[in-house]
């Protein structure tokens, strides 16, 4: 797990912007640039996380507000026993479930075809995608951004901060127009490269996984090659 904090990333962004002493960009602007870069990164390469939750009551609706940064649920096993000494295979994959949001809080609805419903103290094993976090940013306690992608976030944040500065300068009387153009060119170049790298990550994620996923079973008109 990375030990990088928001202060570390903020310092790196300021170095890239040649403003080590924060004479031009304040912390709020830099932090917002980091947020924007993380948000774009999270859409291109969300983190895959697995956890087990114990149900507080009976029912098909399961509150998932304890899962920080949740974006999508990608898999659910139920029934599941984390204390079992023998593996259950194939696992009890739930084929029908829906994630919806109630006043901004995620709720998982389990559409179990056999009529059964989860009971209190049952365990669910859940796979989900989440946005990356940086220690100290918006209350995050740990950094979940892979260390090898920190430089990518720094570049994106610098681009966002530069473009924010351009907006500020354009609205200031007596501003050196040439300086604004140069700064805007720098900001756009940083963001262009940042988004190109995100496209590469997105393409790489699409190529992962098994050749054939789960699908319809064979019927009497189908055949399988050996």
What are these regions (language model features)?
Residues 1-226:
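Glycine-enriched, solvent-exposed interface loops adjoining structured elements
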């Amino acid at each position: 797990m990375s030990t990088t904090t928001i202060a570390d990333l903020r310092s790196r962004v300021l170095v890239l912007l040649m403003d080590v002493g924060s004479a031009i960009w304040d912390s709020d602007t830099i932090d917002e640039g980091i947020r924007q870069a993380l948000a774009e990164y999270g859409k291109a390469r969300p983190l895959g996380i697995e956890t087990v939750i114990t149900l507080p009551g009976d029912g098909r609706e399961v509150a998932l507000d304890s899962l920080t940064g949740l974006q999508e649920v990608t898999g659910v096993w139920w029934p599941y026993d984390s204390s079992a000494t023998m593996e259950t295979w194939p696992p009890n994959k739930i084929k029908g479930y829906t994630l919806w949001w109630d006043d901004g809080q995620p709720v998982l609805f389990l559409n179990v075809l056999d009529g059964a419903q989860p009971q209190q103290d049952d365990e669910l094993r859940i796979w989900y995608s989440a946005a990356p976090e940086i220690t100290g940013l918006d209350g995050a306690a740990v950094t979940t951004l892979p260390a090898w992608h920190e430089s990518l976030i720094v570049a994106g944040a610098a681009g966002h901060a530069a473009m924010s500065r351009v907006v500020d300068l354009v609205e200031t009387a007596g501003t050196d127009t040439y300086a604004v153009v140069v700064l805007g060119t720098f900001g756009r170049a940083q963001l262009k490269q940042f988004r190109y790298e995100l496209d590469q990550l997105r393409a790489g994620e699409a190529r992962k996984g098994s050749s054939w996923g789960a699908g319809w079973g064979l019927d009497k008109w189908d055949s399988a090659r050996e």
